[in-house]
């Protein structure tokens, strides 16, 4: 090596964490989450994951409620999870307005999840652009407990925390993760098609596939999201534009009238939500498992 030269290795740049879980914990502190759990049986895998999630939310300072119910009619099972009563009419509120909550977390009985996936939903619902952090400071004190001042007589301070302010106009009231269906290729989120494309697509919606969704890097809007792993902010079901029954199956009739399709209960909800002005956001990074039984 020539004289006068010295080789210095450059320290590798530190990778910024993909998710700020400490922020997510701060966002749920003092908030109430109600688990909406349709179905009548779960696996031990589900049970262990659910107990851990409950523990972690409480440890982070959040509150939890469980609303579980069952009906052979899935649309009615979901309504029952919201405490619906057919005698209260179309303008009724979830749980008759008597249950305080900030978010509903819908989890189907065959979903495999963990606490990280929940925090990721929170960070999708309250994105970075909706958050303003304000530093909280306090004077630095000497060994005798006396506040230290600088040469101008001003207190020397240190940052001890942050106050978080949220711009509600930038919050996403309906957010979802995704999971594969039984074919192992089709996902639980989809986009609507016009009649011609719907027909050429074999009479099914334009579902994101395992290949297409893994090419996405940022949250995106969808026309439909399955309710297996879905977070809904308070105010959506309370909206006067979202009357009961919230999951009533619909007949989707295309323009010509020659093609029509019966929608499932979750598709019907998404149709109503979009008509009421809500966007449905999916983050392609939030993938949960989907437990299915296979005979071999």
Task: Describe the role of every protein-language-model region.
Residues 99-101, 170-172, 278:
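Short, high-confidence coil segments that cap the C-terminus of an alpha-helix
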Residues 114-251:
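Conserved catalytic core of nucleotide-sugar-dependent glycosyltransferases
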Residues 92-114:
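Short beta-strand-to-loop acidic/aromatic patch adjacent to the donor-nucleotide binding site
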Residues 246, 253-263, 267-290, 296:
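Catalytic donor-sugar/metal-binding loop of nucleotide-sugar-dependent glycosyltransferases
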Residues 49-52, 80, 120-121, 268:
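Alpha-helical elements of Rossmann-like donor-binding domains used by nucleotide-donor carbohydrate transfer enzymes
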Residues 39, 57, 65, 99, ...:
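Cationic, hydrophobic amphipathic alpha-helical membrane-interacting segments
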Residues 2-72:
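N-proximal low-complexity "stem/linker" segments adjacent to membrane-targeting elements
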Residues 74-97, 119, 271:
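Short, conserved alpha-helix that lines the donor NDP-sugar binding/gating region
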């Amino acid at each position: 090596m020539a004289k006068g030269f010295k080789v210095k290795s450059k320290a590798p740049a530190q990778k910024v964490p993909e998710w700020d879980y400490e922020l997510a914990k701060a966002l749920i502190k003092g908030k109430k989450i109600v688990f909406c759990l349709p179905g009548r049986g779960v696996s031990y895998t589900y049970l262990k994951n659910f107990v851990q999630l409950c523990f972690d939310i409480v440890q982070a300072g959040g509150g939890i409620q469980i609303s579980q119910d069952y009906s052979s009619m899935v649309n009615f099972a979901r309504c029952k999870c919201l405490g619906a009563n057919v005698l209260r009419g179309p303008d009724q509120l979830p749980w008759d307005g008597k249950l305080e909550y900030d978010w509903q977390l819908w989890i189907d009985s065959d979903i495999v999840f963990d606490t990280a996936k929940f925090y990721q939903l929170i960070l999708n619902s309250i994105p970075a652009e909706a958050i303003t952090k304000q530093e909280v400071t306090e004077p630095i004190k000497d060994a005798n407990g006396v506040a230290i001042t600088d040469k101008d007589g001003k207190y020397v301070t240190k940052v001890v925390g942050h106050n978080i302010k949220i711009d509600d106009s930038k919050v996403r009231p309906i957010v979802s993760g995704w999971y594969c269906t039984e074919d192992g290729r089709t996902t639980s989120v989809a986009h609507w098609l016009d009649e011609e494309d719907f027909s050429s697509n074999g009479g099914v919606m334009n579902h994101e596939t395992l290949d297409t969704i893994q090419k996405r890097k940022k949250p995106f809007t969808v026309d439909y999201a399955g309710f297996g792993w879905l977070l809904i902010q308070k105010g959506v079901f309370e909206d006067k534009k979202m009357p009961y029954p919230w999951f009533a199956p619909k007949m989707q009739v295309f323009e010509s009238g020659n093609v029509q399709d019966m929608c499932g209960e979750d598709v019907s909800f998404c149709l109503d939500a979009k008509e009421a002005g809500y966007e449905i956001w999916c983050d392609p990074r939030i993938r949960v498992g989907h437990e299915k039984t296979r005979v071999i």
